[in-house]
């Protein structure tokens, strides 16, 4: 990785101004999403990928596939994940970023541009050598709406900016960040290739304030920090058919709010805090209280917990009824929405529930004791 910085300092207009450049030419490494049983594996994606790869390599059974009545045994090379296309280690796959930041009359700002490879995978149903298991011949061809995938890591372009400013009248710091991307890919059960591209607008509004809470501590202020994260899928597609929803499982517009309240006691050696987060569309929340106690210069004890509450898992069209092999899997054409009558938690329902909603049964209690030599 190479970085460069040009510090212009104070100018006629700005109190401070500088520019940064980043060129990441390292070998591409995707995010590690964990394996089955791995703690904190987001949305349990690793288990799903492993199961789907096994389906392609060795065959598997899928319940309620053909017409929603019977389970179906698939031989190898019909459904699942066929291949993973990691970007080559080349200059054309490098990642570039540019940032202009400065200060104007007490307002900090930044403008950012970045082109990069998504470290989260996209599943594209573009397999061209699948076989129809209901015929004796080996067709080795592509089929629309078939849950057979290749995994890709698309290139994403991002532009964004941020503002930081202090409001003295209310003793608060505010942060506003926004970013617009193109090139991101999302699951889409209304498309023959089962994915689509969408521009995405994301934003964050943050507020920090030291606040005295006399009945808790008359001598030391608490830190109160709140943030609101927003996401808008510009090219969102969704339809409701036969009582279930199909298309993009991600919410078109969603918000996640967080709140931190942190205090200090005994000359800052004891610090309790509580963190809360709420996913508005998933109707899911997490509450995480903890206390940190510096017993001595060498010994520290941290006790914490997190408790999740909410509606739990949500269902979404999983394309089991997408009719990829007519007339064996149903009447009509492949992808006929009139046939859509099956939805499930796995895998696309997870995108509706989000990380908090899918962790409703994962309350935790933690004790950490550290000794420093």
Per-region residue spans from a language model:
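Aromatic- and glycine-enriched pocket-lining scaffold segments that form the walls
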Residues: 1-118
């Amino acid at each position: 990785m190479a970085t460069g910085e040009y510090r212009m300092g104070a100018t006629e207009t700005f109190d401070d101004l500088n520019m940064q450049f980043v060129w990441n030419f390292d070998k591409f490494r995707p995010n590690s999403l964990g394996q089955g049983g791995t703690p904190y594996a987001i949305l349990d994606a690793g288990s799903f990928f492993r199961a789907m790869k096994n389906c392609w390599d060795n065959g598997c059974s899928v319940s309620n596939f053909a017409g929603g009545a019977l389970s179906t045994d698939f031989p190898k090379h019909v459904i699942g994940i066929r291949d993973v296309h990691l970007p080559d280690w080349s200059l054309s796959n490098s990642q570039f970023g540019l940032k202009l930041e400065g200060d104007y009359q007490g307002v900090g700002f930044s403008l950012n541009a970045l082109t990069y490879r998504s470290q989260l995978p996209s599943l594209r149903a573009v397999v061209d050598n699948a076989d129809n298991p209901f015929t004796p011949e080996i067709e080795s061809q592509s089929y629309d709406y078939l849950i057979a995938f290749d995994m890709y890591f698309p290139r994403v372009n991002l532009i964004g900016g941020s503002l930081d400013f202090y409001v003295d009248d209310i003793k608060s710091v505010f942060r506003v960040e926004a970013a617009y991307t193109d090139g991101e890919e999302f699951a889409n059960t209304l498309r023959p290739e089962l994915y689509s591209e969408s521009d995405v607008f994301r934003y964050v509004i943050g507020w920090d304030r030291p606040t005295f809470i006399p009945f808790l501590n008359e001598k030391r202020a608490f830190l109160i920090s709140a943030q609101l994260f927003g996401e808008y899928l510009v090219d969102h597609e969704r339809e409701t058919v036969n009582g279930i929803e199909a298309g993009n499982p991600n919410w078109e517009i969603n918000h996640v709010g967080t709140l931190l309240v942190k205090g200090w006691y005994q000359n800052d050696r004891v610090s309790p805090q509580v963190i809360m987060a709420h996913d508005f569309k998933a109707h899911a929340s997490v509450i995480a209280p903890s206390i940190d106690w510096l017993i001595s210069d060498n010994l520290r004890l941290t006790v914490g917990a997190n408790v999740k509450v909410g509606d739990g898992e949500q269902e979404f069209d999983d394309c089991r009824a997408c009719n990829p092999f007519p007339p064996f899997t149903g009447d009509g054409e492949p992808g006929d929405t009139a046939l859509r009558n099956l939805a499930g938690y796995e895998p696309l329902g997870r995108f509706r529930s989000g990380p908090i909603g899918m962790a409703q049964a994962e309350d935790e209690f933690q004790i950490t004791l550290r000794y420093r030599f």
